[in-house]
């Protein structure tokens, strides 16, 4: 009977710890000019970008457990979104960023092992880089630079001359 009580207590403790393992929710919005510039850095996880017709950037998603800091800094012309991981390589969970940006905003995304998915951007410049994450892009930028060292690339579907 005592063994059963100990097992039940341990099981309940494990279940109670599950929410602590989940990441921290992200929900931030900043103004950005229609033709502003956004830079996004995320080491691991996923970065999804969708264009919309508002002059603001909205970031939602989940900050991975163990991440040091999430920052969204800048002004109406330039905005930088960065996920900072601890300098020591400890156990950190992936971060998922879902970013809505003005359709004409220039966009630069750099990741290491995070997938990148961009849809609907019609900017002057689009730059997407990932070391080992996959990249999918669909839009109409004037210039596009897409680099994946060991990840797959599904490139721009329509280019403006």
Describe these PLM feature segments.
Residues 7-19:
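Bacterial N-terminal signal peptides
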Residues 1-7:
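Positively charged n-region of N-terminal signal peptides that target proteins for export
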Residues 21-130, 136-148, 154-161:
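Acidic (Asp/Glu) and glycine-rich low-complexity loops/linkers
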